[in-house]
């Protein structure tokens, strides 16, 4: 067994055990009330809400996609942070959703959409399509973990074994703790993910270049493609001014309309949460995406040049081949933090829609029948297991179109169901 495998297995194993214990420790606390299981009693404090929202956006695709895309397209890709637009959305839209959630007991995006358009059928339509988008997207988080661990251990850990491990810890964590456990773990994952990312950045620079960041520039200054990618429009000409504005607005709008982010607006403790979100969330994005972009436009080209043909695995490749084994394992923890936070948040959102909006509402509430809170939580936990099985099937089949389906189609659809007013 190589040292990369040893360090990765130890760190990821400890992380997984800790996560399962933390989730199951909340089992009894969340079993008696849907308000606790779905909404954490609408009592999440400001720091936790900022961390939970930010890390739920970062996903395994950010870990792979941002360095890869910026490596190919240039520094203009950082416009995808959405800048101040992201904070503005939560101050303007998120705050109003919070008020409506408190007033009418909203839990899911469907609660609001159904009420806004006065249509049960529209609610069913949106719920089905949102769940249809969520399942492959969560599966994609598992795929990134499987690929990342396989690369980080230099093939020692099989892809599907890593996927099963990630699936198990997500399932047990959501099953046991609901939103209470998810929000707490997201805070831990934000600190872990950002911290490990910057450890990787510093180690790659110190270990591979004399003179720090100046040494990195010396390595790329004679490569016209790499130099062009340090600014806009980049070597490909992709990031013109309209292109940058389009990227910024699209990314920022997509943030709040994703179901798992939408639901974050309901769990805030007070108005102050949204005042801080207005500046705290863009700051959280900046801390993370700056590190990912630096790897893509600066460190990656400095080490590998501009013609690297495995850009889609840029971060794990650099961590495994140009950093000590312990740092490679640390980078794997960063991927775990991003992918698992997004995966479990979307899983919880999807199971809430299946259970509450599709089953309980139409089987009980619309017929005037009572629905016991304990039973609803129990049914939700069953749906968690069923949905995870569905995701494993997708991961096993691994259809080639899953990235296009989950990533390119879901964001525009989620954005289109947001009401115009």
Q: Which residues does each predicted region cover?
A:
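Selective recognition of specific alpha-helical transmembrane segments in multi-pass small-molecule
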Residues: 13, 18, 125-140, 173, ...
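Loop-to-transmembrane helix boundary motifs in multi-pass membrane proteins
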Residues: 116-124, 131, 160-164, 355-399
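Membrane-interface "cap" regions at the ends of multi-pass membrane proteins
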Residues: 1-64, 174-177, 190, 196, ...
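Hydrophobic alpha-helical segments and their helix-loop junctions in multi-pass secondary transporters
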Residues: 18-30, 94, 134-142, 146-152, ...
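Membrane-interface helix-loop-helix modules in multi-pass membrane proteins
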Residues: 38-105, 243-254, 261-307, 318-342
């Amino acid at each position: 067994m190589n040292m990369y495998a040893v360090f990765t297995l130890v760190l990821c194993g400890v992380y997984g055990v800790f996560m399962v214990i933390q989730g199951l420790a909340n089992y009894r606390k969340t079993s008696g009330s849907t308000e606790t299981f779905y909404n954490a009693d609408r009592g999440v404090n400001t720091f936790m809400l900022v961390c939970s929202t930010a890390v739920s956006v970062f996903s395994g695709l950010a870990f792979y996609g941002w360095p890869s895309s910026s490596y190919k397209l240039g520094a203009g890709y950082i416009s995808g942070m959405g800048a101040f637009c992201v904070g503005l959305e939560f101050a303007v839209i998120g705050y109003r959703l919070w008020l409506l959630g408190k007033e009418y007991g909203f839990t899911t995006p469907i609660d609001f959409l159904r009420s806004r358009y006065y249509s049960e059928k529209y609610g069913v339509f949106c719920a089905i399509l949102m769940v249809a988008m969520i399942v492959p997207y969560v599966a994609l988080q598992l795929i990134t973990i499987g690929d990342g661990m396989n690369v980080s251990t230099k093939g020692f850990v099989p892809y599907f074994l890593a996927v099963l491990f990630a699936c198990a810890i997500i399932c047990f964590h959501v099953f046991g703790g609901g939103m209470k456990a998810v929000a707490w773990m997201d805070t831990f994952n934000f600190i872990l993910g950002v911290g490990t990312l910057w450890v990787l950045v510093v180690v790659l620079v110190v270990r591979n270049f004399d003179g720090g960041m100046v040494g990195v520039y010396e390595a790329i200054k004679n490569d016209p493609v790499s130099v062009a990618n340090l600014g806009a429009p980049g070597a490909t000409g992709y990031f013109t001014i309209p292109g940058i504005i389009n990227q910024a607005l699209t990314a920022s709008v997509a943030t709040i309309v994703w179901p798992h982010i939408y639901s974050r607006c309901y769990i805030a403790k007070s108005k102050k949460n949204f005042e801080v979100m207005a500046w705290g969330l863009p700051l959280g994005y900046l801390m993370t995406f700056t590190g990912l972009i630096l790897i893509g436009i600066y460190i990656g080209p400095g080490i590998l040049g501009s013609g690297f043909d495995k850009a889609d695995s840029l971060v794990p490749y650099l961590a495994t081949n140009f950093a000590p084994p312990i740092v490679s394992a640390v980078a794997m923890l960063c991927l775990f933090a991003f992918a698992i936070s997004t995966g479990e948040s979307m899983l919880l959102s999807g199971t809430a829609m299946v259970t509450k909006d599709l089953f309980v509402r139409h089987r009980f509430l619309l017929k005037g029948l009572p629905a016991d809170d304990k039973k609803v939580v129990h049914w939700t936990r069953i749906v968690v297991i069923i949905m995870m099985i569905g995701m494993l099937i997708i991961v096993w089949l691994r259809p080639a179109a899953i990235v296009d389906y989950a990533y390119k189609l879901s964001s525009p659809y989620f954005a289109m169901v947001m009401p115009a007013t």
